[in-house]
Amino acid sequence: MQEQYNPSEIEALVQKHWHDNKTFEVTEDANKEKFYCLSMFPYPSGRLHMGHVRNYTIGDVVARFQRLQGKNVLQPIGWDSFGLPAENAAINNKTAPAPWTYENIEYMKNQLKLLGFGYDWSREIATCTPEYYRWEQWFFTKLYEKGLVYKKTASVNWCPNDETVLANEQVQDGCCWRCDTPVEQKEIPQWFIKITAYAEELLNDIDTLDGWPEQVKTMQRNWIGRSEGVEMTFGVAGHDKTFDIYTTRPDTLMGVTYVAIAAGHPLAEIAAQTNPELAAFIDECKNSTTSEAELATMEKRGVATGLFAIHPITGKQVPIWAANFVLMNYGTGAVMSVPGHDQRDFEFAKKYGLAIEAVIKPVDGEVDISEAAYTEKGILFNSGEFDGLDFDAAFNAIANKLVAEGKGKRQVNYRLRDWGVSRQRYWGAPIPMVTLADGTVIPTPEDQLPVLLPEDVVMDGIQSPIKADKEWAKTQVNGQDALRETDTFDTFMESSWYYARYCSPQADEMLDPAKANYWLPVDQYIGGIEHACMHLLYFRFFHKLLRDAGLVNSNEPAKQLLTQGMVLADAFYYINEKGARVWVSPLDVATTEKDDKGRITKAIDKDGNELVYTGMCKMSKSKNNGIDPQVMVEKYGADTVRLFMMFASPPELTLEWQESGVEGAHRFIKRLWKLASEYIAQDNSEALDVSKLTSEQKALRREVHKTIAKVTDDIGRRQMFNTAVAAVMELMNHLQKAPQTTGQDRAIIGEALSAVVRLLYPIIPHVSFTLWNDLGNTGSIEDSQWPVVDESALVEDSKLIVVQVNGKVRAKITVAADADKDSVEALGMNDEHVIKYLDGLTVRKVIYVPGKLLSIVAN
């Protein structure tokens, strides 16, 4: 073997072997247990970042580990290749999104291969290809036929100057990113999929996701947001109109002092006809882009409509206010306001001088609402016939009365809204719907699919090419003129079913059910927790749609989910002559000074600028603190980068990028290489004979098999890859100190190295592949078996016992593994150190914890 570790040479040879032998290409095999390992596929932005590397290294470690368990392992890869960034890049680079995207795919594909990931490249997909989105379009038409798709108007960001829709990220400080025109809200028709039809199942089935993190499950439960309440009808004084309000706290109904409605509520529109102040307020609200998330922090404002609501039980009139904290697209667009028992309502009432009444008090005291609302559940008072009831009794009594009088109904509501899948962008899959000359809207016939997105286009940065090209929309259906839909799908559509397409990527149908049901569900899914409430929910929803279409037979798409943490790096900046921050790459920092705790106190870049250090931050372009994986691979090798990624932190926590840590990982690999080289250079013909081993040799062999047991558990069950690496490093320390004098010495080292290269194979596959063969093993390491623990090697001949005198450790003694209390006590009492500390004392008590501790109490 080569004496020196040369990563670039080794990795090129091993990667060529994998490519030539199609090592990771798999087919269905009913005789083997399958394992489907999947990392969330990347957007082809142009270059991999360290977040990608961490995600894909974790996936590769799991896949390679399962392969050595003898399983039929599928690990595919592809490209989430539609989306707005490609449009922006095309505008900036004066090209079209398609060539920019395909060039990026090729570049990033090469980067992935250089990192040694064991993907089945024969299954590669790109979601921007007609071969992929054709089946998405087909499935959408089937959902439409089942009544799960509908069209309605919804609000979008609208630039009146360019007359175009803007994505949220194209709105900067309320203005168009391109022309700085104030952005308006505009209602336009959009397509929706009825995810709410599956809300209950999506919620209930969270309980079956035993292999998913609790945090993700909690986030999804909250996002779906099931609540039990009452929907009641309020009248409007002086009008024959009514409106509905939903509440989960009907126990507070008797404390309603005003009603708040959305600016877009029909009652607000009516009142605004004679109320200029209200009309102006409505216009202001319509042109703001307030999201649900922003409601909690924004200033609460409102205008009285001049209308009064009639309380459904008391008949009392309460004022109706239009308020900016009520959204028309959430609930009924109206809320009953109980300022005595809701803090937001309390603050609004104080601001506008509205009445505040208390109707709930603690079980064991009085209520004080002079400074804040009392928001806990309690006992009703000031509530007429409901006085004295607790929450549950009041809920039922008030609900029953409303139902009996035809003024309300019990209702289960969900926070979850239907999925709006229309995007007014170009670079996405065209929505396969057409409008006939008579206005009828129908799905594109199957024989006209796919509806192709033209790729040879010019991006002007203003309007989608397929919206600008009036000829593109023209088509014929059954001999009739028709116009195609010019909106494209939300890119979450593509990422909601890609995992299933990998099972049969060349199939001339959406899925080959036999292949899909062999591989699905995914056994291990890996990706960031930021996807908990969007992608991961749509992912689950789409799987249920596929199931109900008869394409898959499982209820959930993935058994286990691992959410890896972010990768952080040092961030530095200086202030330039214009007073602006200039962020400096950590690679361009020339010198640093640190305090006694290792914290950076001073830094200077290569140009001599004194820098401000802001700490460890998420790697990002904005802070210029991203580290190019390719630079690190060229400098240290892919195995070193992979090893650092797995060792530096538990997978679900953030990882702090430290090049000193990378250097440490590199030194470890060189130590392993050196030990193997020294071993191979000797006469290793003597076979291991456990009956001939000395106690020291048995102890070393015990460490080998303890390490096998720990690493197997750490990777296979606990998924604590960092502690698995630490265990192998500790074993390596023992092996480096061990003698290689006798034949049995070397036989144990040989057994240990054979185990170590397999234990590390998932993490540093190139080195392991090479050393496996250099150590004289036949066949490829990919076809070997994971090392098995020899239970007999774990049996200890002796035990190390700690001896305490009056609670302080005074000695450590070695005893036979089966020694009884009397013999241990005798040895302990006769130890020279113990004798010294017992001098002049009388032993009062001796406690023995078998195999661990001998405690002597004396005075």
From Swiss-Prot:
Disulfide bonds: none annotated. Its main location: cytoplasm. One of its GO terms (molecular function) is aminoacyl-tRNA deacylase activity. InterPro entries: aa-tRNA-synth_I_CS, aa-tRNA-synth_Ia, Leu-tRNA-ligase, Leu_tRNA-synth_edit, M/V/L/I-tRNA-synth_anticd-bd, Methionyl/Leucyl_tRNA_Synth, Rossmann-like_a/b/a_fold, tRNAsynth_Ia_anticodon-bd. A motif ('KMSKS' region) lies at residues 618-622. Keywords: Aminoacyl-tRNA synthetase, ATP-binding, Cytoplasm, Ligase, Nucleotide-binding, Protein biosynthesis. The keyword RNA-binding does not apply. GO terms for cellular component: cytosol. SUPFAM superfamilies: Anticodon-binding domain of a subclass of class I aminoacyl-tRNA synthetases, Nucleotidylyl transferase, ValRS/IleRS/LeuRS editing domain. It is found in: Cytoplasm. Pfam families: Anticodon_1, tRNA-synt_1, tRNA-synt_1_2, tRNA-synt_1g. Its EC number is 6.1.1.4. Belongs to the class-I aminoacyl-tRNA synthetase family. This is Leucine--tRNA ligase. The lineage of its organism: Bacteria, Pseudomonadati, Pseudomonadota, Gammaproteobacteria, Alteromonadales.
